[in-house]
Amino acid sequence: MTEILINGNFLCRNLTGIERFAWEICKRIDSLLNSSDRVSMLVPANASNIPSYAHIAVVRSDKEIHGFSAWDLGVFAKACRSRNACALSFSNTAPFGKTCGIAFIHDVYAKVFPNDFKSLYDKLIGAYSRLNYYNICKNARLICTVSNFSKKQIMDYYGVAEEKIRVIYNGFEHIHTVNADESILEKIELRGRKFYFTLGSLSLRKNLQWIMKHAELYPNELFVISGAMLKNVVPSELEKIKLLKNIILAGYLSDGEVKTLMQNCKAFVFPSYFEGFGIPPLEALACGAPIIVSNAASLPEIYGSCAHYIDPFKPNVDLEALLAEPVSSPVPLFEKYSFDNSAKKLYEILKEIGR
């Protein structure tokens, strides 16, 4: 088998959906490997939390990662060439040209909504993202993505042949390994109170505006928002949110704190207008919470009849009435969207490419 070299850049990033996917899939791929498989991972020198694998060979680089271009186009690309290995990249980035290998594009957000990138810094991030989409679509041996919605967008925007793209779904199993941390209920004074919960990095597509405008219209409803602040959230919006007494900005929370809020909320609200998959509502369902999600992008494909739907641009919605409407059991979703199943699918791809 040709060596597969995994891009360990995700080990130096905050744990959002893309990084979660990489962590969970690599852990399960490791359990599927046998002695004839050659799979390694190149890890930056400044990665602090390095996984322990039984079969994936962890190669520690002496170079740190401080910019994706320097790592992906330099250190990682050079390692792929010197080892004659096929690259496997999970994070929407990959080496340029013939060393691109197998690469994941989780979504093409920067291509579809370029105007969401407001500041000069964000415009550079958007341009770099689009450059990576183009490189992967042109040069990858195989493209993986996380929904049929994203697959179609890759085909439509970049003219990629359908047979060059494989859909490998996200999963939810990790939430069951997390110990709930109920101290968060006292920390932000939620014990005994009814509230809606939303989770996600506070980028424009997560649609913080919907929550803000809805909270203004329904002052008796309480919302808890968790997520790290990003540069492309308009500061004036955040200042206005801080003035609303029925919104709690909880900041970045631990997995245990998030699990507790999912277990105790009236519903998990996810008004994002663009998602390649959207893991948080699946986590919430696994915690027993009803979910209210946007009717846009991949979300109807992923959640089907198991979710309550809202228009991401119309915040005047009676959520109590919406929650009274019947939805289907989420059990079929747990059977369909599984990291275990997705790892098996990716392993078959690696064997196919590595022959």
Language-model segment annotations:
Residues M1-R355:
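Carbohydrate transferase catalytic cores enriched for Leloir-type hexosyltransferases
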